[in-house]
Amino acid sequence: MVMNAPKIEEILPEFLEFCEGAVMVAHNAEFDTSFIINKAEKIGINVDTTIIDTVLLAQFLMPNLHNYKLDTLTKHLNVVLESHHRAVDDAAATADIFVKMIKMLYDRDIPDVDKLNEEGKMDENAIKKLHQYHCIILASSEQGRINLYRLISASHLQYFSRFPKIPKSLVNKYREGLIIGSACEAGELFRAMVNGRSEAEIARIVSFYDYLEVQPIGNNRFMIEKDDYYVKNEEDLRDLNRRIIALGEKFSKPVVATCDVHFLNPEDEIYRRIIMAGKGFDDADNQAPLYLHTTEEMLHEFDYLGSDKAYEIVVENTNKILNMCEDIIPVRPDKRPPVIENSDQMLRTICENRALELYGNPLPEIVKERLDRELNSIISNGYSVMYIIAQKLVWKSNDDGYLVGSRGSVGSSFAATMAGITEVNPLSPHYLCPKCYYNEFDSEDVKKFAGGAGCDMPDKICPRCGHKLNKMGFDIPFETFLGFKGNKEPDIDLNFSNEYQSKAHSFTEVIFGKGQTFKAGTIGTVAEKTAYGYVFNYFKDKSEKEGRPIVKRRCEIERIAEGCVDIRRTTGQHPGGIVVLPIGDEIHSFTPVQHPANDCTTSIVTTHFDYHSIDHNLLKLDILGHLDPTMIRMLQDLTGIDPLEIPLDSKEVMSLFKDTSALGITPADIGGCKLGALGIPEFGTDFAMQMLIDTKPQYFSDLVRIAGLSHGTDVWLGNAQVLIKEGKATISTAICTRDDIMIYLIQKGIESETAFTIMEKVRKGKGLTEEQETIMREHDVPDWYIWSCKKIKYMFPKAHAAAYVMMAWRVAYCKVFYPLAYYCAYFSIRANAFDYEKMAMGRDKLEYFIDDYKNKKSLGTITNTEEDELKDMRIVQDMYVYAERLLLI
């Protein structure tokens, strides 16, 4: 068709003469006009004309289109396009589109190009739609690190469109301390050369970069196989590298040989191939050798340049860039807690006032000593602000009608109890008169319950005024929370009602000010099962595509899958973590920020780094959502009972954990379940109820121990369970919570700091050192105890268990004394899979489905939904004792 057409040298001057004084219009003009300008330069003609790009113009006039391809615009504007990608038809369609756009411009009172340029200045949305290039940004100084984080944040928050982007103008704004490299084949310079841009344009591009990059031929070999590039063979690729080197020499820019590393070793490409296939890439099998080359390998890759030039770009210039960089680390090493003015005195005043209100003036010596010791440690180590923040959050929730449950070891702090942060009183069991402040801490009656719970003690009348004494204390050492020297990093975790959690999060902004709090970011990685699925499906799809069987043994699939495990998959947010930025600091000195999972529809902003990476810098508040406070709020509304007034020594409630008598039913009525604990938080699962049956709890403190056992990892199964069955330990002597270890070892005469260190090591699953074992044996610690310590993988603190059992007990109390209110609250809040037709049509029909689901469970064919339904069915069966059937809706 063009065989006999004039050569470019003949026709181009005529074409440019024809265009003289006119405005050129093109669709994706940057690409098309680059060829004209390039060819014109080669024959000595300078092209200086105004160009309008219908892509950019359409983005300005019609910003809501999903793309701006020529065929998309023709359909949108009802323009005829008969043979797309045929030059004449495309040009005609572009002209028709432009004519319609001219009318749209006049409608907007834009009569000329000058006004168009003024009105069409780039905003964030327009920038998002621009063609993008890769570049390398290195931080060469501390200021550069901060500027880099500013750019990363902007790329995720302002300019994200399918992936993060940043305009060059923003790079220039924050250029201090940054070194900019021209990157790979997807970089602006390489693309300009491949697309035949003019020398002037290439010179402009080069001027932006601090150094230029060339890469091994194998990295870009794919260009030879594609028709999109005017690259015919490897020599063309070498010529492109030679041109980049020549540009570096011409413009005094160092040229560096880089690898564009995506994996470490050559054989690791299989992992990238599988991950890309799992994400739907059609060309996943065409992997370039993007591994980390050695210096010798890189010198060999560039030997076509001669040994001197190869050494210069591989070794000398690489080190030149390195020497431009200071020694910096990605995260700041210093701790920057938030500041609340007068927090030290504020905490001391709140705690002392509450202690005087509760225990009277003067305070009992044991109370005063504990409170003073804690406050001195908390304040001297700079943790008072953490307490005040928690106090403000809890008090606000309480004022709004919701209890807050404590998590972790904060309940071991008496100061936290006095500040109203936790309900757990960690003092040793004691009697206290609420009327005249009479107290007993060291009587023989009290000493019998050392290590237990005050609520387990028998009732007693005040010998001074005749009022019934309160029974208090869980006997938890403060050192579990802060260490003996205040050298343990404390963490205050709180369980707010799931209905109230978002309000608690918002209240942190009230405390610290707008822009000072961020959601704690997380990084989601490829899990083991997901990786296995990727590998399995990869070979399955490959087999179907190639029409031949590809058989891989399970062990081979697992081996390959192991290389895909823990690869970053997505980002997210901690369910309750709030990171607090001190006033006066900039978040970018610690971390970039972004939307979780790059969801631009949400207003939530998270830390870009996983919060663990910066938890030594910034305070993270754990403001979690939990169902217990929500359920207790509903029970309070239904019954009028103040949950704080519910006694923790009810024999009827305690009996739920031993049999079904308090409910007036038999195990036969509820499918053979021997206990009344169904539907009680922490104790209603088959696993927990079997623990109750095995341990036979008699006291509230036994329930705390059982909760510790059930929450831990390798604490009960294959450990305490075995020891109790063998008669080596009881529920009272087995290791149930981390505190047990430290207290027991100190009682054995081991130095307190050593006991604390052993506890910390064991509770994290790190076992015991030989030296620690020797110390324990020297102090007559039995072998079974040492064996138990070495089996433990993770242990919860006693304060955590106590707080959870207190919440569970209140629910259990309502199950015994206010059953209909209990079931109403349970099915409103805790039921996950309630099915009216299966569960509310009579006991016979219900039990038919229960038997059916239990049979499926034994055969391993039950689905997750059916598993959830079965849990709810068992509570409904429980409820049928109190009502013949649910009222028909």
Write out the residue ranges for each language-model feature.
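Noncatalytic, beta-rich nucleic-acid-contacting surfaces in large DNA/RNA-processing enzymes
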Residues: 282-283, 338, 342-889
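Metal-dependent phosphoesterase signature
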Residues: 1-12
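Phosphodiester-processing cores and adjacent nucleic acid-binding clamps
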Residues: 3-5, 17-19, 27-30, 34-569, ...
